[in-house]
Design a protein with these regions (language model features):
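Substrate-contacting helices/loops that form the catalytic groove of nucleic-acid
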Residues: 1-85, 165-182
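Positively charged, low-complexity nucleic-acid-binding target-recognition regions
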Residues: 76-182
Length: 182
């Protein structure tokens, strides 16, 4: 985006034009790289699911969430360019082909409610201040949990409300890191 913005400003100044063949080539090349990466990344996810007998994939989704982002001009330029909907669509398609159930629950209020405290991910329980640092969430009991792990469990709870009805020992306290080489 920054490169295109610079090219457009220069073109406007010199030739009073908005678009050029060079900008089109640059955009096409970038889009092809992004599509290639999405293809490879989603294939890795599906292959991982198959190898580990995972029959359901859950991916939280908020409609229009990038349009309301306010992270500053530069960060917004980079963030809005990430084709999240394309990734979700590609995962959905590949899951269907592989016989894997794909669910996309709405993910609002999952990052500010506590899984370990048994809170429902609803507006009444939402408290943004418990996310104390980037990547760290503190429960009402004072326990610390990785914020992404907490949010993921809450998204799973939205997709499958009875998933943790029998409890889960040490949930979120001992996450497993899975490295997938690119």
């Amino acid at each position: 985006n920054k490169k295109i913005s610079d090219m457009r400003a220069e073109l406007k100044k010199r030739h009073n034009a908005d678009w050029s063949k060079e900008m089109q080539r640059f955009t096409t090349k970038r889009n092809n790289k992004v599509d290639d990466y999405i293809q490879k990344a989603t294939k890795m996810v599906i292959d991982f699911c198959k190898e580990n007998n995972i029959d359901t994939l859950v991916c939280g989704y908020n409609t229009g969430w990038k349009q309301e982002s306010d992270m500053g001009k530069r960060v917004n330029q980079k963030f809005v360019d990430i084709p999240h909907a394309s990734i979700v669509w590609r995962l959905s398609y590949k899951c269907e082909t592989a016989g894997i159930l794909f669910k996309t629950p709405e993910e609002s209020f999952t990052s500010g409610t506590s899984f370990l405290d048994g809170e429902e991910p609803i507006k009444e329980n939402y408290d943004k201040s418990r996310r104390v640092h980037r990547g760290l969430f503190v429960t009402k009991k004072g326990e610390e949990i990785n914020a992404d792990v907490n949010g993921s469990y809450q998204i799973m709870k939205k997709a499958f409300p009875n998933a943790f009805a029998d409890g889960i020992v040490g949930a979120g306290s001992h996450p497993i890191v899975v490295n997938i080489p690119l």
